[in-house]
Amino acid sequence: MKYESIRPQVEQIAREAGRIILSFGEFHVEEKEGHANFVTDVDCAVQEYLAKVLSDLLPGSHFIGEEQENEQLTCAPTWVIDPVDGTTNLIHNYRQSAVSIALLEDKHPVLAAVYQPYTDELFFAMKGCGATLNGQKISASSHPFERALTCFGTSPYNAELAERSMRLALAFLQNAADIRRSGSAALDLANVACGRIDVFFEIVLKPWDFAAGALLVTEAGGRFMMPFEDGEIRFDCPRGILAANGKCAEQALALIRSI
């Protein structure tokens, strides 16, 4: 595959970014626009590191990160990253945060790495090559919808969507097996990919939250959809997303669209 040669370096970079996260004993917290929307100097340090090493790894590539939103996605090779997905978890030492790295070409993911530094779990995928966890092949689950464990995401700074998110969560609680909320979409998508959970949805997510996870899910045999719109899956602006195993996907999609 085209980017197979850089896989070892990307994996090493993801792990080093995780080590940076773990190296901070204390850190400074600032609020961004919106209620309870935080950024720390950990986010900034990891993004600065990733911007440099990924650009050096693939000269001429572009870079879009959560803490630097000003670049527009083009067809050129572009790194789309979230330096710390789960910043609020990090602040509270909840230990559910991840480094999310995706390489997009022609505006779609071709390489993905999600690293959970607290458990030393590295999820990796390349288009057409399957998905792995610490080098071992992974696949989405085969649980039917009535046995599905569902994760969902929402955020205090999208308060206008909170009520609908909770209605959807209640519907899944009443129709599937159970629900969870982890606070890290990248990890939730990775957990769909490896079969730990069966469904994940969120009404609005930024591309750096889901670009890597989308490729992990599809390469693991799951389904990745945008349930609130028709047409091509896009990674150039905020979207609502649904990820599920093949057995759950259609029922989950129908339930979301019915609420």
Predicted regions and their residues:
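Short glycine/threonine-rich catalytic loop with a Thr-x-Gly-x-Asp
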Residues: 43, 90-93, 179-182
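Residue-level signal for inorganic ion chemistry
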Residues: 21, 43, 54, 87, ...
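Short, isolated positions in well-ordered beta-strands
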Residues: 110, 138-140
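N-terminal subdomain of lithium-sensitive/metallo-dependent phosphomonoesterases centered on the IMPase/IPPase/PAP
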Residues: 1-84, 254-257
